[in-house]
């Protein structure tokens, strides 16, 4: 059943089923105008075409419309995909990276498109992410911070993006958490304080000290019972009482 926008090809021209080399599929219901068509500009119709006709994916990897190449790459044989790593369209390159064995992703570590590098960061093994620690895009580095081996994380402690530093603080070996005592972002220090409360008991930000009051041991709590902020004193007193029970 037709759905979505008017069925036009990727150049904006009306589709002509009679001129399509796959018109024989109409009778079997494996394609249909406004529903399932590899020449439609609407991605969902192209996707449906290859879901119904996966055996046709390989021969359409060179289709002139990038979205058709992307959808064909979803179901094509992986042995046909390496050449797509050099495709002119980043969406096609990204799909190839996601489907090919991880070793192929190394070729696109320096790809000019951030979406491709994001795909690479997801595919490389944790030990292979070292070259991406200095990627210019913050979201790429965030994925690296989430997946890299912990031994690489000290190199990201001073990352310009606070979201990246927060992820590093969550995963890094606790011995390195003292590097975050002077981090300019309180929310980053809060993450570090959850793991080593004692380092942040005298932090300038009440949110960080409140985290210490919630996570700290007796030594930290005894110092916080005289904190100038009511909520921190109360939390520390309550937790001390609970620990004594």
From Swiss-Prot:
Gene3D superfamilies linked: Leucine-rich Repeat Variant (1.25.10.10)
Top-level taxon of origin: Bacteria
Pfam families: LRV, LRV_FeS
Disulfide bond annotation, renumbered to this chain: none
Name of protein: Uncharacterized 27.7 kDa protein in nifB 3'region
């Amino acid at each position: 059943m037709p759905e979505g926008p008017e069925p036009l090809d990727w150049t904006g021209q009306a589709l002509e089923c009679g001129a399509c080399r796959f018109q024989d599929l109409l009778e079997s219901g494996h394609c249909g105008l406004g529903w399932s068509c590899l020449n439609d500009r609407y991605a969902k119709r192209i996707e449906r075409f290859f879901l119904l006709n996966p055996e046709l994916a390989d021969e359409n990897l060179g289709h002139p419309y990038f979205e058709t190449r992307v959808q064909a790459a979803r179901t094509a044989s992986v042995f046909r995909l390496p050449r797509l790593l050099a495709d002119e369209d980043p969406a096609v390159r990204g799909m190839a990276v996601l489907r090919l064995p991880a070793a192929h992703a190394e070729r696109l570590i320096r790809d000019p498109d951030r979406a491709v590098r994001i795909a690479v960061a997801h595919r490389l093994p944790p030990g292979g992410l070292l070259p991406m620690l200095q990627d210019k895009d913050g979201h790429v580095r965030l994925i690296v911070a989430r997946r890299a081996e912990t031994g690489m994380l000290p190199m990201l402690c001073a990352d310009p993006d606070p979201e990246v530093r927060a992820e590093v603080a969550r995963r890094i070996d606790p011995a390195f958490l003292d590097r975050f005592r002077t981090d300019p972002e309180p929310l980053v220090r809060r993450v570090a304080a959850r793991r080593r409360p004692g380092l942040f008991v005298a932090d300038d930000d009440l949110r960080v000290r409140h985290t210490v009051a919630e996570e700290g041991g007796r030594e930290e709590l005894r110092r916080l019972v005289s904190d100038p902020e009511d909520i921190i004193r109360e939390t520390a007193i309550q937790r001390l009482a609970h620990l004594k029970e």
